[in-house]
Amino acid sequence: MTDLSLYRNIGIFAHVDAGKTTTTERILKLTGKIHKLGEVHEGESTTDFMEQEAERGITIQSAAVTCEWKGHRLNVIDTPGHVDFTVEVYRSLKVLDGGIGVFCGSGGVEPQSETNWRYANDSEVARVIFVNKLDRVGADFLRVVEQVKKVLGANPLVMTLPIGREDTFTGVVDVLTKKAYIWDDSGLPENYEVTDVPADMVDEVDMYHEQLVETAVEQDDDLMMAYMEGEVPTVEQLKKCIRKGTRDLTFFPTFCGSAFKNKGVQLVLDAVVDYLPSPTEVDPQPLTDEEGNETGEHALVSADEPLRALAFKIMDDRFGALTFIRIYSGRMEKGMTVLNSFTGKTERIGRMVEMQANDRNEITSAQAGDILAVVGMKNVQTGHTLCDPKHPCTLEAMVFPEPVISIAVAPKDKTGSEKMGVAIGKMVAEDPSFRVETDEDSGETILKGMGELHLDIKVDILKRTYGVELNVGKPQVAYRETITQAIEDSYTHKKQSGGSGQFGKIDYRIRPGEPGTGFKFSSVVVGGNVPKEFFPAIEKGFSTMMAEGPLAGYPVLDVEIELYDGSYHAVDSSAVAFEIAAKGAFRQSMPKAGPQIIEPIMKVDVFTPEDHVGDVIGDLNRRRGMIKDQEPGVTGVRIKADVPLSEMFGYIGHLRTMTSGRGQFSMEFSHYLPCPNAVAEEVIAEAKKRKEEKAKK
């Protein structure tokens, strides 16, 4: 297929358990890609193909599937709903042109829905909404529509209305055409009939139809004038307006149904084709220089342009190493040579495949707009740009969050050590939010991630997929250090031992930076007291020392250092001398600047039945939580709080005990805050103890 207007690159994203994967399964069934439906709760779904996914009933990796609907090519990505795997959602949104936001008809707008919606807004991805599970007890379509308005600040445009409620839910009314779609009891998605609107719904449908028309015609001044003069717009005219409003993020066409019961999914697929943009209708990707600054040029969406593509995911499966690629410009063909603009090296394109979850179809070429996988690429990582060697360029980089939790692991025997090294190398390539370090003193391997579940899954993969038996330590919090006072100081490095010596003197100011800014270095030196060529060495000296603070050896955050004077020696001064001076200055000045331990604070979202609210709030308060909001729902209460990560280990078990198994929660990193003195003293004492134990070894 070469007509780019017939392409749709879409993602399906939502909260855990809203029915994303089941919706994807129904799409595959309807588009003829699978013949037997696999259910998530039975561990059989097509896109949840990792053992851990099938077992836990959650999607961990973004599985890519290609299918067709009404002459259009759909590249569909099913993304995880659990907050520990939001990096998968983020990088999927980076390469998508549109999306389906799935909400649970009874649960409504749940915690992860907000996070994913925020990411999609940041990426300016057009979306349609599917309110799922309307066959469930407590499901209420219009209540969820109101929540979308209130909680997400979005403008849902009601396109279908449910016929019946809960166990009497039989179909939907298309508000645009005023036709009813009613499914029989066979459970087959194709077994439905199109009839007139049920008599008891005529007034409601008329009201929503009028609202739809009035909202749609606002996208076209001429059509709006004609409508105000009494002219009735055609369905095609309205579709054109809805398409424009959807692409501009003015509103979000909103549908209802039950993916599990095979009701209503066809209309969502029609909406993908009718309203979501093709690759040619989204803003072209900006090109950047080596520092990541935009150059003003763009990757134009055309097969005739030079190749510009982004590697957005690395995955090791039973077929070998796969690199998932979105092509923005030009063509990619089997056997061609491409330049990796990040490494400066070229690679030959070997086997190219079109993915269907865990199956693949071999292809020999692909073009702008395509999402594909290449087998066996050697030096490509997530976020790397692949381009025509004659036209080098760099696409906007992908930035991933820093881990907030770590655990120490060690193989139980020597044979596991080599296996673990190979396995971890593959896992780090696959997941940019998963980091691994080796403790130089103890030799322990430290795994770092976004949450307990994230690391649990990684340990599980090491054990079961790669057969590495492990000893696993307790989770550790990623504490940091910062300063609270601004000081002015001076440091001289002087060394004379025969022949040429070393000399470097720096006068500098150290002050607390804005939260989240990391380390900033600047110079206001006038004249030649410290030559400019030594500035990078001074910055490097300070920057290197930020890795280990004076209190407990944790990395230092949010510090600004300003060089304002100094002196040098024409013979003895060098970059090395000034770098050593900066390191000495850090050691000298940090203890004077009011150093402080800071801890990661998590944004916690708890759902609890109403009769357990007091227990849950009391427990969060005991965990040093700050309650931010309480929102009553149909089946319980949602509590939002900021809680230190150190207080949240093992929380899910405690919550289930408190709420008789009915409570749920999610959390994501929010910000760092100073620890209370008692906690800081404990952290410092623990660090001192570790240091002493290492010294004995």
Curated annotation (Swiss-Prot):
GO terms for biological process: ribosome disassembly. It comes from the Bacteria. This is Elongation factor G 2. It comes from Saccharophagus degradans (strain 2-40 / ATCC 43961 / DSM 17024). PROSITE patterns: G_TR_1, G_TR_2. GTP binds at residues 14-21, 78-82, 132-135. The gene is fusA2. Catalyzes the GTP-dependent ribosomal translocation step during translation elongation. During this step, the ribosome changes from the pre-translocational (PRE) to the post-translocational (POST) state as the newly formed A-site-bound peptidyl-tRNA and P-site-bound deacylated tRNA move to the P and E sites, respectively. Catalyzes the coordinated movement of the two tRNA molecules, the mRNA and conformational changes in the ribosome. GO terms for molecular function: GTP binding; GTPase activity; guanosine tetraphosphate binding; translation elongation factor activity. Keywords: Cytoplasm, Elongation factor, GTP-binding, Nucleotide-binding, Protein biosynthesis.
